[in-house]
A protein has these predicted regions:
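Extracellular loop-to-transmembrane helix junctions
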Residues: 9, 32-137, 246-249, 256, ...
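Inter-helical loop and helix-membrane interface segments of multi-pass membrane transporters/permeases
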Residues: 40, 109-144, 186-208, 276, ...
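Short, Lys/Arg-rich, polar N-terminal cytosolic tail immediately upstream
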Residues: 1-11
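Internal alpha-helical transmembrane segments of multi-pass membrane proteins, especially GPCRs
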Residues: 46, 94-97, 161-167, 240-248, ...
Length: 303
């Protein structure tokens, strides 16, 4: 990667390592997860993000222990469980990770098309209708996946050089969105108005939402820091800090988004319950409802 092999020959710093982790974590999940979690669990979804982050942090710290011990190992990420367990277990896990990576690509493409479809109302129903992609929508998603492939094949050096800048942008947009939502409209009563409790559907939903609403998925990607463990400056110090730091930074952003989303909804919209919410491009549509059209444009561009 170009940000590893800099012209000055310097090894990437802790900031660059955190940027790698944050850049890999922040994807399409934040565009939908706060809405899906609110709809499924109600305001108690805030706790779901903390649980998801703790699970990711546990895995991150275990990964850090191995990565620092084998920091000079070539291809550590691919051989991680072969080193810690055995070749058979490592093969099974590596295959599972490969399938997960394959699934991530169309998931990101679907998220992009679902958001962008709402920016063009005249063709929206032709691409995405009744919470499902049409045949045309699936074809557009496939074309976008091909574009992603060419972008990564030919543009990887350019993107790698700009990794830190891209990461700052990826953090700025959700953070700015959360702050603007809080400033534009915040209804504290939303946190307990339905059934008079923060957990109208039960506290068990707080745990279920971690898996079913894309919360843990939104933290997926921090492990990519270990791919560059051999090139990092002072890996024994920087790998644990980068892994933990990237997860915690993203947790703060996600909590801001979740709290701002819950607070920004008009109380009249949830009289019948959080499960009655119906958005296809949640944050962008909410921005339009609040009259913050420029944020909606930024969200569409970011998508």
């Amino acid at each position: 990667m170009a940000f590893i092999e800099s012209s000055s020959g310097k090894q990437p710093s802790l900031f660059s390592a955190i940027a790698i982790g944050v850049g890999c974590i922040v994807g399409s999940g934040w565009l939908f997860a706060s809405y899906k979690a609110s709809k499924f669990a109600g305001p108690v979804a805030i706790g779901s993000w903390v649980i998801g982050a703790l699970l990711a942090l546990m895995i991150a710290l275990l990964l850090a222990e191995i990565a620092t011990f084998y920091s000079k190992e070539t291809g550590l990420f691919a051989r991680l469980l072969t080193i810690t367990h055995n070749g058979d277990f490592g093969f099974i896990n590596a295959s599972s990770n490969w399938f997960a990576t394959i699934i991530t690509i169309p998931a990101e493409a679907e998220a992009s098309i679902q958001y962008l479809a709402q920016a063009f109302p005249k063709i929206s129903n032709s691409v995405f209708n009744n919470d499902h992609f049409t045949h045309l929508g699936i074809a557009v998603v496939c074309l976008l996946m091909v574009f992603y492939g060419f972008l990564n094949y030919w543009g990887i050096k350019l993107l790698a050089k700009a990794n830190n800048t891209i990461t700052v942008f990826k953090l700025t947009v959700p953070a700015l969105t959360a702050i603007i939502f809080m400033a534009a409209s915040f209804h504290p009563e939303n946190f307990s108005s339905y059934h008079g409790t923060i957990a109208p559907y039960g506290y068990d939903k707080m745990f279920t939402a971690v898996v079913t609403c894309g919360i843990f998925y939104s933290f997926y990607g921090f492990s990519m820091i270990t791919v560059f463990s051999k090139e990092l400056k002072n890996p024994q110090r920087n790998i644990p800090l980068a892994l933990a730091g990237s997860v915690l930074i993203c947790l703060v952003i996600y909590l801001m988004l979740q709290i701002s989303f819950i607070g920004a909804i008009e109380p009249s919209e949830i009289i019948g319950g959080w499960h009655t919410l119906d958005f296809t491009s949640p944050l962008a549509q909410l921005a339009i409802i609040l009259g913050i059209n420029w944020i909606a444009v930024v969200l569409y561009v970011d998508a």
